[in-house]
Amino acid sequence: MKQVVVLSLILSFFLFFSCDKKTKIEKAVEAIPVQIKVNRFDKAFFETAPQDLPKLKQEYPFFFPAGNDDSVWLEKMQHPQWRELYTEVEKLYANFDGKTAEIEALFKHIKYYFPETKTPKVYTVISEMDYHNKVIYTKEMLIISLELYLGSKHRFYDFPAYITQNFESNQILPDIASSFATTKVTPPNDLTFLAQMIYVGKELYLKDQLLPETSDADKIGYTKEQLMWCQENEGYIWRYFIENKMLYDSDQKLIPRFINPAPFSKFYLEIDNETPGRIGTWIGWQIARSFMENNKVSLNDFLKMDAKEIFEKSKYKPKK
């Protein structure tokens, strides 16, 4: 009985210490001055009269690349399908204040961990539905393509379900964090499956720090059911990777099977259709988390570390 009490006290102490540490971080984050102004280029473009196009081009020169005749932009401004798309965007995003506040909170977290980061100019656009570039982040600019956040079932989308499931409004923030993360996590020269898993795992661990209020499902872009499947089958997945000697395998076919976006992961077993895509990404995330739980290393140092060292010091051991 005494042992139970002692263990409970120890557990309570660590939980208190962990929560207290998080509270201190969040208080420090809140105190960081960040002011985001979202420039609604989508509104400006579709609400500008054709005769005022020259003024718009002066205000937003970077959205009008040289070589395109004005007739291209005038056609887009007035085309019924483009205008219908703008109407659909306006139904959801006429007021962007809520998202602006969320973006400010994200950049406060970014500046807490990376103080040298400049606050970018933020622009919303309606583009060509390039789902590979839903968000574009540079040191100076952040561009959000709102036509790709109309809801997974929107009638305008003609893409596979595993892609459109992340066309929801709640994916805007995780997508911004992902775009930022690619500037802080360097792709490894090591081509092993383990190194590739930990590379994407680092990005997700960074999202843990930048988006503390965001669910794990939203951070990785899974449904709740897909996340639950990973959690319930973590031991099985890991055993499969070990038994098939995949960790130090440099076969690049493992990347599309287990890391790249896909409708399901390819174990080449009966369970494949039950699985979400990117199982290897999820495992890499758990290894990253395990390492940071078991080692006193700064976030910046962790992001620069070698995958093999991270794995060996992670003490990663999934539940059976």
Predicted regions and their residues:
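Sec-dependent signal peptide recognition
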Residues: K2-I10
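Acidic/His/Gly-enriched intrinsically disordered linker/tail segments
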Residues: Y205-F267
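Sec-exported extracytoplasmic/periplasmic mature domains
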Residues: F46, P61, P65, K111-P115, ...
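Acidic/His-rich structured neighborhood in mature extracellular/periplasmic domains
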Residues: W82-C230, N300, K304-A307
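Extracytoplasmic/secreted envelope proteins and their assembly/folding machinery
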Residues: V38, E104-F107, E203, K207, ...
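N-terminal mature-domain "stem" immediately C-terminal to a signal peptide or N-terminal signal-anchor/transmembrane
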Residues: D20-L85
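C-terminal soluble interaction/assembly domains
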Residues: D251-K320
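C-terminal motif of bacterial Sec signal peptides marking the signal peptidase cleavage site
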Residues: L15-S18
